[in-house]
Each structure stands twice: as C-alpha cells, then as structure tokens.
Amino acid sequence: MTSFAQLDIKSEELAIVKTILQQLVPDYTVWAFGSRVKGKAKKYSDLDLAIISEEPLDFLARDRLKEAFSESDLPWRVDLLDWATTSEDFREIIRKVYVVIQEKEKTVEKPTAL
C-alpha cells in the first residue's frame, strides 16, 4: 500500500472524490490503483477506484457514483471497479500498489442495558 503523497491528483480533486464517495458509498472501503498511483499518469489519465466488498455493488449505487463523478468538476474520468466481481488474478495486481481513499465506516453499537 502507498500513501496519499503518491496519489497523482491535486488536493482539491481528492476532496471532490472523497466527498462523492462519502455521500454515496460510506459503507465501503475504496482504493485507488493504476497509473495515478504508480506515477505513470498523464494529465488526463483516468482515476481507477476499486469498491471493496464481498458482495457486488448494487446497480443503483454504481449508477449514482458514475453520474456523480461524470457531473463533477474533475478534469478526468473516474473508472469504477467492483471488487466482488473482479478476478483473483486482477485483485493480486491491484494489491501490489494501491492507495486507500476511504475506509468503510464503522458502526458503533450502543451497549444494551443489563
């Protein structure tokens, strides 16, 4: 895993990405991978995001994410990858170099009264 310092996007772009993810998929961990993490991005290279979950992302959530990213002020495209439907071979490639963009929200249960 790498750090945010190695993610090749501007801080204001990262803020947009994180806001969209937090609003639409707060219960998922999200990793960036690909050229923007490996230091091989060109000016308009896309941002590859893996939505990490054991269950496939539902179509409505995926469509909302795609729409939010396409309507945002980001100067490049965001490609979404559903971890649950990704082959183990490709998962291994991603695991070599990625950046955590969002951690799954932890729900805190209230203690029950005795």
Swiss-Prot record:
Catalysis: reaction(s): L-tyrosyl-[protein] + ATP = O-(5'-adenylyl)-L-tyrosyl-[protein] + diphosphate; O-(5'-adenylyl)-L-tyrosyl-[protein] + ATP = O-[5'-(adenylyl-(5'->3')-adenylyl)]-L-tyrosyl-[protein] + diphosphate
One MF term in the entry's GO annotations: ATP binding
Note accompanying the cofactor annotation: Binds 2 divalent metal cations, probably Mg(2+) in vivo, Zn(2+) ions are found in the crystal structure.
InterPro entries: NT_sf, Polymerase_NTP_transf_dom, Type_VII_TA_antitoxin
Motif mapping: GSX(10)DXD motif: 34-48
Keyword Magnesium: yes
Active site location: D46, D48
Keywords for the protein's UniProt record, in alphabetical order: ATP-binding, Magnesium, Metal-binding, Nucleotide-binding, Nucleotidyltransferase, Toxin-antitoxin system, Transferase
The protein's enzyme class: transferase
Function in brief: Probable antitoxin component of a type VII toxin-antitoxin (TA) system. Neutralizes cognate toxic HEPN probably by di-AMPylation. A mixture of HepT and MntA binds nucleotides; the highest affinity is for TTP, ATP binds more tightly than ADP or AMP.
Stated name of the protein: Probable protein adenylyltransferase MntA
Naturally occurring in which organism (per UniProt): Haemophilus influenzae (strain ATCC 51907 / DSM 11121 / KW20 / Rd)
Gene name in the database record: mntA
